[in-house]
Amino acid sequence: SPAEMIGKLEHGITKHGLPQTFAAPLALCAVGHDSVTRKTAADALASIFSSLRRRAAEFRERYASTMDAAVLNRTALTQSAEYTLPYLVFLLAHHPDLPSKETGAANKGVAYRPFQQMLSFLVGTLTAGSKQCLPAAIKMMSLMKRTVDATNVDLSHGLYVMADIALLVLNKLATQKGWETGQFPGQISWPKAFFTLQERRAKGEPLEEGGAPRVGDYSHLPVGFELKSAAAPKQADGHRSKA
């Protein structure tokens, strides 16, 4: 059952130190599942993120006096809750229902709506009551276009679209809550099994025929794309996550 699988993933991460890769699939519960399953997944993610934050804090404390600050920031990020987000982007880019490039770009990107809701579900839980993750999460999503898919370069477009949607979710949330996003003081260390660095940022399709390619944040976001709230159920503290 979904609840049993959710429980196993939560237990594996919080009790046995499994990496964030195993947390990303829980966001898929945001779409096509009943409210009980969504709540179970949201509560599990909240528990997982709390555990990961402790893990990252313990790592920092352990190596603060022996590790260079830049290396410490980069390495501690790989232990953090927000490091789940790149894995979810990768997972969604490989999702069998991800629309083609042409279908996704049509009708203001409506075909990406379920994927946005899954990203919103994760981000809403990740930022519940805290803005600590925003600088690193935003930087990772912004720099995703300096990578290609390490397993299949032809799927890289999906990475860029998902990262742009996640970036939109993060920035809109920060605006709604009046949070300063700040700058993450370190480089990003990408999991090499999933992402391969490249020298230049990937370019998106021009806004009009014959125009210059789009570059930078939102370069791959469908024109006219707007966010729709995810069905984020109440968590254990009684508050709803907001996308």
Task: Please provide the spans of the model-predicted regions.
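Short coil/turn segments at helix-helix junctions and helix-capping linkers
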Residues: S1-A3, T14-L18, L28-T40
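Short intrinsically disordered, low-complexity coil segments enriched in acidic
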Residues: S1-L9, K242
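Residue-level signature of alpha-solenoid helical repeat scaffolds
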Residues: G7-H11, A24, L28, D43-S47, ...
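Eukaryotic basic, amphipathic alpha-helical target segments in cytosolic regions
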Residues: I13-Q20, D34, F49-A56
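Alpha-helical solenoid scaffolds in eukaryotic proteins
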Residues: T21-L28, Y87, F121
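Long internal repeat-built scaffold domains in very large eukaryotic proteins
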Residues: A42-A243
